[in-house]
Amino acid sequence: MAFNLRNRNFLKLLDFTPREIQYMIDLAIDLKKAKYGGYERKHLTGKNIALIFEKTSTRTRCAFEVAAFDQGAQVSYLGPSGSQIGHKESMKDTARVLGRMYDGIEYRGYGQEIVEELGAYAGVPVWNGLTNEFHPTQILADFMTMLEHGKGKRLDQIKFAYLGDARNNMGNSLMVGAAKMGMDIRLVAPKAFWPEEDLVAKCRLIAEETGARITLTEDVKEGVLGADFLYTDVWVSMGEAKEAWDQRVKLMTPYQVNMDVINATKNPDVKFMHCLPAFHNDETTMGKEVADKYGMKGLEVTEDVFESEHSIVFDEAENRMHTIKAVMVATLGD
């Protein structure tokens, strides 16, 4: 391997150099080609992996399970009600137990400090499947997808805008990733929903070294002009109370990704991205609740954008598996 990432934790992109991040993306691209070409080699044969999910999941769980199986590993799924973590046993103790039984551990849950503690005490590679603050595996998939659809541009030649709640784990993680990789990111959101100032300051310092361009703006037209990609996420994050909806919908409606926003980029080839799940119609229980309460069939993105030729959300979702596989192979593989 070009880089020795063996036995490293994957907790947040702040812990990695641009070259290490690019290596994992390149490895994911190679692994994807190998899977499609029928010549994939197993690098995790005989490995046992624990998947801790304190929050529910579709893409992250399936991506970890399929990636592990493809590479010859076995997994144990510990769901929100399937363990003693946090109830009868501390994460510190859990880490020291699971680290004796498993070769690698994935964690999806709440505070970043929890996965950091798990990583500090497990003694085996720990991978962050999502916390309230960061979602690093998603960013690898996003950047891989941008490379696939970027018409030959390197990451440091790509401009993209993130619209909506920019203080959540996706806003944080995209900003960190863009800073590391020298990209042009525009965080387009109400000022109250910009990332924490200390994280912005860290990213601006990184940007001084990488040439990244970080813009925080409330102006949608300014933020999206010339963008290669538009990105959004749900307006109310996992675990937030439903009572937050009323104020959030009122504040965020101007930042909805609709065809007017697509056209405002002045880029006919602009692509739309979303980490999913998305509220783009009224065909789900929550989507119907939103439609009934607010008279909107889509929230952060409209149906016509989501289903348009601009949308690459399902390529992006697939790449979760390939990039997660790359992280596991890089940190645990033979």
Swiss-Prot record:
InterPro entries: Asp/Orn_carbamoyltranf_P-bd, Asp/Orn_carbamoylTrfase, Asp/Orn_carbamoylTrfase_sf, Asp_carbamoyltransf_Asp/Orn-bd, Orn/put_carbamltrans, OTCase_ArgI. GO terms for molecular function: amino acid binding; ornithine carbamoyltransferase activity. Carbamoyl phosphate binds at S57, T58, R59, T60, Q84, R108, H135, P136, T137, Q138, C275, L276, R320. SUPFAM superfamilies: Aspartate/ornithine carbamoyltransferase (SSF53671). Keywords: Amino-acid biosynthesis, Arginine biosynthesis, Cytoplasm, Transferase. Coiled coil: none annotated. It comes from the Bacteria. Its EC number is 2.1.3.3. The keyword 4Fe-4S does not apply. Pathway: Amino-acid biosynthesis; L-arginine biosynthesis; L-arginine from L-ornithine and carbamoyl phosphate: step 1/3. It catalyses: carbamoyl phosphate + L-ornithine = L-citrulline + phosphate + H(+). Signal peptide: none annotated. Pfam families: OTCace (PF00185), OTCace_N (PF02729). Reversibly catalyzes the transfer of the carbamoyl group from carbamoyl phosphate (CP) to the N(epsilon) atom of ornithine (ORN) to produce L-citrulline. Belongs to the aspartate/ornithine carbamoyltransferase superfamily. OTCase family. This is Ornithine carbamoyltransferase. It comes from Aeromonas hydrophila subsp. hydrophila (strain ATCC 7966 / DSM 30187 / BCRC 13018 / CCUG 14551 / JCM 1027 / KCTC 2358 / NCIMB 9240 / NCTC 8049).
